[in-house]
């Protein structure tokens, strides 16, 4: 579960390394899960890239440490909290996605991120 002030690693090559959640988008929502869109600020970035430190960005959560139950009865959790930076059209700003992503992204119409990911769990 991601809430305000949570730090996430960035799982793409947009230039940001770490972001901090400042708002979970949705009507009065407190927690974000896999597939939810958040507003975040860039805390650590690589120089000369598309995203700079202290930029305000939108991102979609692709991995969480919290256990996630699926309809089939399986449960899944990842080793880190990670997100992919997106633009207003829900397309990723980077051209590569690092690490596995959850299958729930396909159901939430983030098919571009799913196609760029090396592994879908």
From Swiss-Prot:
Gene3D superfamilies (alphabetical): Ribosomal protein L14
Gene Ontology molecular function terms on file: large ribosomal subunit rRNA binding; structural constituent of ribosome
UniProt entry keywords in alphabetical sequence: Ribonucleoprotein, Ribosomal protein, RNA-binding, rRNA-binding
Keyword Ribosomal protein: yes
Domain of life: Bacteria
Any Gene Ontology biological process: translation
Tagged with keyword RNA-binding: yes
Classification via Pfam families: Ribosomal_L14
Self-association state and partner proteins as the record states: Part of the 50S ribosomal subunit. Forms a cluster with proteins L3 and L19. In the 70S ribosome, L14 and L19 interact and together make contacts with the 16S rRNA in bridges B5 and B8.
Family from the record: Belongs to the universal ribosomal protein uL14 family.
Its job: Binds to 23S rRNA. Forms part of two intersubunit bridges in the 70S ribosome.
Cross-referenced HAMAP family: Ribosomal_uL14
Descriptive protein name: Large ribosomal subunit protein uL14
Organism in which the protein naturally occurs: Synechococcus sp. (strain CC9311)
